[in-house]
Amino acid sequence: MVAPIKILGDRLRRALQAALPLDTYPQPLLVPASQVKFGDYQSNVCLSLAKQLGKAPRELAQEVVPHLEVEDLCQPVEIAGPGFLNFRLKPEFLAATLQAARGSDRLGIPPAREPRRVVVDFSSPNIAKEMHVGHLRSTIIGDCIARILEFQGHTVLRLNHVGDWGTQFGMLIAYLDEVYPDALTTANALDLGDLVTFYKKAKQRFDSDPEFQQKARAKVVALQQGEEQSRRAWQLLCEQSRREFQKIYDLLDIQLTERGESFYNPFLPAVIEDLAACGLLVEDQGAKVVFLEGFTNKEGQPQPLIIQKSDGGYNYATTDLAALRYRIDKDQADWIIYVTDVGQSTHFAQVFQVAQRAGWVPPHVTLTHVPFGLVLGEDGKRLKTRSGETIRLIDLLTEAIARSRADLEQRLATEGRTESPEFIDTVARAIGIGAVKYADLSQNRNSNYVFSYDKMLSLQGNTAPYLLYAYVRVQGLTRRGDIDWCTLSPDSPLLLEDETEQHLAKHLVQLEETLDLVSTELLPNRLCQYLFELSQLFNQFYDRCPILSAPQPTKQSRLTLAYLTAQTLKLGLSLLGIPVLDRI
């Protein structure tokens, strides 16, 4: 199955070439109609070309329409207003398209014609610190982008660029050496919560005790030089954090390949050497820097990006440049995506600029920063605990599951239903975690959003429970009607007689174009909105059109439409990282 918008776009392009031959045409040629009264798709290409060609848009439209060969897809194309072209898909085309999608796990969506090698850099917590609510968005958004690109046939390397190197390890090792030396030689000697507490105390000592500062810096040097005891201690600390991170990744069903900052240490000197060789690196106040184009300080002078500090140390920019080169040269990536908070936008713009000016980024390679806003509490401020502490991510997820369980148990009591503990555990976890993911992904990532358990767990509105319930309604048909989807005849026609059937069918065939839009804009909320509207359209169809009691062949047709809706919801939710449930 090829998306209708792609077929119509190709036909429109051919018609334009026949009627108005030009080297290029305005893009996009075609978009989904803004309102039902304008059809299913619209084009304003004639309006865009009017000035260039010196003709009225409507006159141009009248020249183009006779060359449009779309009789197999659409009703006669309508010229509307000053020169818009309106396209309405035929029910026969919709039925044939959906029938072709029925037998495919991919719902007829073909993989990309030109698959890319993509690196998605996301999550990236710091060792010896607990993951907090600030890591939620990067982890969920990055995973969703990776899932969609993988589905489209791209090769995706999901990288976790953990903060596993730096001065903080010298502080921590020096402090533990004094107060709890067993932690530096024995696995599992302390948990991550204790490690965080020790880290805070080590930081206080470092800031107030010059002698301790010297000891910490000596530990950093020992670590950098590969001294066995220091390196063993560092490995134990990293492993302890890694185990705790994995508990969260397992809960969220996140797959990642860890490649921390320390991995790139051997490549840092080459960054300095090569930037110097190409004439970009200069010395400024003892530091080695690259002066940036388009970035200025308060005095209006070019702003420097520090590559090597005056004491000879490296920083985040150095590591990110080394990582970028490695991903292009060794991983052979032709698209690198960084998913971080909006506060790092300037940093990545500067790193990308230096890499491009140094000639490290071939023309076929795309560098993309995917920024996102803050998670806010219901008071409109950054989400924190009542005592003002940053919320631990594990606590946030555990609370979501607990609230989901309480809602489920209350509903079971009201309905007089008895379910097994295993059922309650599975449903509570799926809805709780799914609600957290969907609440995040359904927002435009560029915006801040308000975190509310009550809203995200509601069965009403644009929420995960609402979508999961729509899927459950379809599965309920199989139980009440004793129906096996596998026995539905593949040759039975889709009738699409009722208006709600037609609206649902039109929406179902738009999945591919929705995924294309998401992978272009990297905005998962587009997919969420599609699935929400799909659930609404299905519920309208379900409430208006008898299914199990309908006569044949209407019953078979409507069951097929319900089945396709369920499969689309299942696929779409899986791309958001949310599993479906047969019962809730």
UniProtKB/Swiss-Prot annotation:
GO terms for molecular function: arginine-tRNA ligase activity; ATP binding. GO terms for cellular component: cytoplasm. It catalyses: tRNA(Arg) + L-arginine + ATP = L-arginyl-tRNA(Arg) + AMP + diphosphate. InterPro entries: aa-tRNA-synth_I_CS, Arg-tRNA-ligase, Arg-tRNA-synth_N, Arg-tRNA-synth_N_sf, ArgRS_core, DALR_anticod-bd, Rossmann-like_a/b/a_fold, tRNAsynth_Ia_anticodon-bd. CDD domains: ArgRS_core. It is found in: Cytoplasm. A motif ('HIGH' region) lies at residues 125-135. It comes from the Bacteria. Keywords: Aminoacyl-tRNA synthetase, ATP-binding, Cytoplasm, Ligase, Nucleotide-binding, Protein biosynthesis. The keyword Transmembrane helix does not apply. Coiled coil: none annotated. GO terms for biological process: arginyl-tRNA aminoacylation. It holds the Pfam family tRNA-synt_1d. Signal peptide: none annotated. Belongs to the class-I aminoacyl-tRNA synthetase family. This is Arginine--tRNA ligase. It comes from Thermosynechococcus vestitus (strain NIES-2133 / IAM M-273 / BP-1). The gene is argS.
